[in-house]
C-alpha cells in the first residue's frame, strides 16, 4: 500500500478496520488535492482558480436515507419519531460491506476538528473516495496545525464512498443511498451520494448528540459580532439567509451555519462557509461573490462557460442548490478564532412562503422558544432532493434533520440561556411580501439588512410597536429608511380578504404543528401560540 502525507504513526487505517487499500493520501494540502481531482477527472478549474465539481443525481441532501443505529445506549436518547433506525446487526453488515468496497481503492484522509472551542470539539477523521471531497471537508471543518498531526487521535470516523450502493434488503435501508450514523461506535458511513454536504452535516449531527449532555447548546445558525463584541445568532434553514445576512462588512463573522453556545460564549463548529450561489451577484453579496471564484474554493454544480471557464451563477440547469465552499478567512472580516462572547441578539429567520409575516418582529422569551420549536420556514428550491418550488414546512429547532435528540432538549437549553443572559430575540421574514409565493415578491435584501442593523445597534428597541393581530408578536410601526406599508403585511396585498384567509390558514398550521410539543413546554410557551385577534372579514 502506498501512503503519502503526514499522520499519527499509531493511528493508521487498521484502527478503523480498512484493509488491502491501494493507497492512502493523508492530510493533503489544497494544491495537492487540486492536482489529484483534476488528474482523476473529478473536477475542472474555474477561471478565477476555484475547483468546480458536479455531484450527479444527488444535488442536495437525502434526509430519508439517513439512519441512526438503535442500540441500548441510543434507545432512550434519540428522538425516534424524527430519525430512521437500523439495528446494530444491520450496521455491522453495512460496515463490513463498506470495508470490502474500499479494498483496492486509493483513499484520501483528513484529520480535522468539529468545533473551535478545544473544550467542546470532536476529532473527526474523514476518509473519502474523491479528492475534491477531501478538499471540501478540509475546507469546511477546522484543521489542526501541521505539527499537531503526529499526535492526532480520531474520536469520530467518517467514510465517504460515492461508488458504494446499499442493498435495501440486505442492509435494512430505503434505497441504494445511505447515511448510517452510529453514535455508540462513533462511525458514519456515506454511500451512493456525491453531494459533499452530507459529510459536514454528519459531523454536525454528532455534535448535536454529544454537546447537550455537557450543557452546551448546538445550533443550526450563523453568527457575527459587532465592534463592541456584541454577538448575534441567526437561526434558519438552508436558503433563508444565514450565510448572506451574517456576512456583514460592519461586523466580524464567526461562521455561517453551525455553532455551539456554552457558558463561556459562542464558538463555530466549522472553518469554512457553504454558500448558496444561485443568482449570486457582486452588487448584492460582494464578499461571497469575491470568495466564490478563487484558489481554494470548491464550486458545487455551478456551470462554467465552455470556453472561458467563468462561473455562471445564474445558471440553475443542474440544480437551484448550487454551492460555494470556501475557507472562513476568505471573508475579510472573519474571526480568526471562531469564538466570541455570549449573544446579545438572536435572529430567527423564516422564508414565509405565504407572504403574511412581517419583515421583522420582536419576540418575548416564551415566543422565542415557541418559534424555535416550531421552526417555520419554506423548503427552498434544491436544498433537498426533489424540492423544486418553495413549500411551507415546520422544521423544529430550525434544523430537524440534524437533531438526534428530542426538540425539547434543545428548546429548554435555549430558553435557559436566553433567560440567563437576557438576550433580545427577533423573528425576521426573508420570504415573500405582497402575496404568497407565485404572486408576491421576495423580501428585498436591502430592507432586511436595514431592519437587522436597527435591531443589532439597539435603535429598534426605541421604536413604537404594535401587536400583530394574527401572530401576537410585536411589530415596529415605523423604521427609518423603510417604507411604512412593508411593515404591515396586509397593506402589501391587493386582495385583503385573501390575505386574511391566508394568515388564518397559517395560524392554524402553526397550532396543528405545535400540538406534539404541548406536553413538553410550560404554560408560558403554550400561551405564546398565534391566536387570531380580529374577526373574520
UniProtKB/Swiss-Prot annotation:
Gene3D superfamilies: 3.90.228.20, Phosphoenolpyruvate Carboxykinase, domain 1 (3.40.449.10), Phosphoenolpyruvate Carboxykinase, domain 2 (2.170.8.10). It holds the Pfam family PEPCK_ATP. It catalyses: oxaloacetate + ATP = phosphoenolpyruvate + ADP + CO2. Its EC number is 4.1.1.49. Transmembrane segments: none annotated. One of its GO terms (biological process) is gluconeogenesis. Binds 1 Mn(2+) ion per subunit. Substrate binds at residues 61, 195, 201, 323. Keywords: ATP-binding, Cytoplasm, Decarboxylase, Gluconeogenesis, Lyase, Manganese, Metal-binding, Nucleotide-binding. Its cofactor is Mn(2+). Mn(2+) binds at residues 201, 220, 257. InterPro entries: PEP_carboxykinase_ATP (IPR001272), PEP_carboxykinase_C (IPR013035), PEP_carboxykinase_N (IPR008210). Pathway: Carbohydrate biosynthesis; gluconeogenesis. Its main location: cytoplasm. It is an enzyme of class 4 (lyase). One of its GO terms (cellular component) is cytosol. Belongs to the phosphoenolpyruvate carboxykinase (ATP) family. This is Phosphoenolpyruvate carboxykinase (ATP). The lineage of its organism: Bacteria, Pseudomonadati, Pseudomonadota, Alphaproteobacteria, Hyphomicrobiales.
Amino acid at each position: 500500500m502506498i501512503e503519502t502525507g503526514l499522520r499519527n504513526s499509531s493511528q493508521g487505517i487498521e484502527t478503523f478496520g480498512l484493509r488491502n487499500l491501494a493507497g492512502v493520501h493523508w492530510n493533503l494540502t489544497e494544491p495537492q488535492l487540486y492536482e489529484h481531482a483534476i488528474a482523476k477527472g473529478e473536477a475542472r478549474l474555474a477561471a478565477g482558480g476555484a475547483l468546480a465539481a458536479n455531484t450527479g443525481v444527488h444535488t442536495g441532501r437525502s434526509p430519508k436515507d439517513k439512519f441512526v443505529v438503535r442500540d441500548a445506549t441510543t434507545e432512550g436518547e434519540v428522538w425516534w419519531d424524527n430519525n430512521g433506525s437500523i439495528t446494530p446487526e444491520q450496521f455491522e453488515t453495512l460496515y463490513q460491506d463498506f470495508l470490502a468496497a474500499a479494498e483496492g481503492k486509493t483513499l484520501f484522509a483528513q484529520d480535522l476538528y468539529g468545533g473551535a472551542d478545544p473544550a467542546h470539539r470532536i476529532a473527526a477523521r474523514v476518509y473519502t473516495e474523491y479528492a475534491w471531497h477531501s478538499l471540501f471537508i478540509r475546507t469546511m471543518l477546522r484543521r489542526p496545525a501541521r505539527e499537531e498531526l503526529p499526535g492526532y487521535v480520531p474520536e469520530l470516523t467518517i467514510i465517504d464512498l460515492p461508488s458504494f450502493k446499499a442493498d435495501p434488503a440486505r442492509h435494512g435501508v430505503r434505497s441504494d443511498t445511505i447515511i448510517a450514523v452510529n453514535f455508540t461506535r462513533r462511525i458514519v458511513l456515506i454511500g451512493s451520494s456525491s453531494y459533499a454536504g452530507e459529510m459536514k452535516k454528519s459531523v454536525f449531527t454528532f455534535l448535536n448528540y454529544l454537546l447537550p449532555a455537557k450543557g452546551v447548546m448546538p445550533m443550526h445558525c450563523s453568527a457575527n459580532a459587532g465592534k463592541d463584541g456584541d454577538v448575534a445568532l441567526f437561526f434558519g434553514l438552508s436558503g433563508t439567509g444565514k450565510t448572506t445576512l451574517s456576512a456583514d462588512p460592519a461586523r466580524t463573522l464567526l461562521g455561517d451555519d453551525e455553532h455551539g453556545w456554552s457558558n463561556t460564549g459562542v464558538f463555530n463548529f466549522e472553518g469554512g462557509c457553504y454558500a448558496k450561489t444561485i443568482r449570486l451577484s457582486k452588487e448584492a453579496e460582494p464578499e461571497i461573490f469575491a470568495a466564490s471564484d478563487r484558489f481554494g474554493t470548491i464550486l458545487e454544480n455551478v456551470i462554467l462557460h465552455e470556453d472561458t471557464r467563468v462561473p455562471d451563477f445564474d445558471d440553475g440547469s443542474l440544480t437551484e442548490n448550487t454551492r460555494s465552499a470556501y475557507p472562513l478567512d476568505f471573508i475579510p472580516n472573519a474571526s480568526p478564532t471562531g469564538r466570541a462572547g455570549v449573544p446579545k441578539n438572536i435572529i430567527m429567520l423564516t422564508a414565509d412562503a405565504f407572504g403574511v409575516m412581517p419583515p421583522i418582529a420582536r419576540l418575548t422569551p416564551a415566543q422565542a422558544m415557541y418559534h424555535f420549536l416550531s421552526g417555520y420556514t419554506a423548503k427552498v428550491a434544491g436544498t433537498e432532493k426533489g424540492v423544486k418550488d418553495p413549500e411551507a414546512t415546520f422544521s423544529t429547532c430550525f434544523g430537524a434533520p440534524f437533531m438526534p435528540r428530542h426538540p425539547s432538549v434543545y428548546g429548554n437549553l435555549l430558553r435557559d440561556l436566553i433567560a440567563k443572559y437576557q438576550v433580545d430575540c427577533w423573528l425576521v421574514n426573508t420570504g415573500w411580501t405582497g402575496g404568497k409565493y407565485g404572486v408576491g415578491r421576495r423580501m428585498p435584501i436591502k430592507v432586511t439588512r436595514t431592519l437587522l442593523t436597527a435591531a443589532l445597534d439597539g435603535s429598534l428597541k426605541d421604536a413604537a410597536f404594535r401587536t400583530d393581530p394574527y401572530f401576537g408578536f410585536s411589530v415596529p410601526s415605523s423604521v427609518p429608511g423603510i417604507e411604512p406599508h412593508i411593515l404591515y403585511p396586509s397593506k402589501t396585498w391587493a386582495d385583503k380578504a385573501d390575505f386574511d384567509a391566508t394568515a388564518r390558514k397559517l395560524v392554524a398550521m402553526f397550532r396543528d404543528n405545535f400540538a406534539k410539543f404541548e406536553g413538553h413546554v410550560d404554560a408560558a410557551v403554550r400561551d405564546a401560540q398565534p391566536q387570531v385577534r380580529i374577526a373574520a372579514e
